[in-house]
Amino acid sequence: MTRIIITGANGKMGHVIRSVVAGREDCTVVAGVDFNTQAADFPIYKTIAEVQEEADVIIDFSNPALLDDLLTYSAAKSMPLV
């Protein structure tokens, strides 16, 4: 099963990705990152550095200002970022 982190998890596209993943059996959202930490079926953090869950990929629909932090995290974890 593919474990996903969604950045921008509470935005419009984040909600679309959450909905798509919820209807699948081969992947799951393990964490989200968003300035709005509104409750979800998974933990949502304000920064990528706070995420403790193991994941296989980051799907990014966040603000471009967060790109440097996302690239640093992705490289440190050897995790694809799309």
Where would I find each of the regions flagged by the language model?
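Beta-loop-alpha module in the N-terminal Rossmann-like domain of NAD(P)-dependent dehydrogenases
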Residues: 58-74
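ADP-ribose/adenylate-binding Rossmann-like module
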Residues: 72-82
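Short amphipathic alpha-helix with an adjacent loop that forms part of the alpha/beta core around
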Residues: 43-54
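NAD(P)-binding Rossmann-fold cofactor-contacting core
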Residues: 22-42
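N-terminal Rossmann NAD(P)H-binding glycine-rich loop of SDR-like oxidoreductase domains
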Residues: 6-18
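Structural motif
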Residues: 56-57, 80
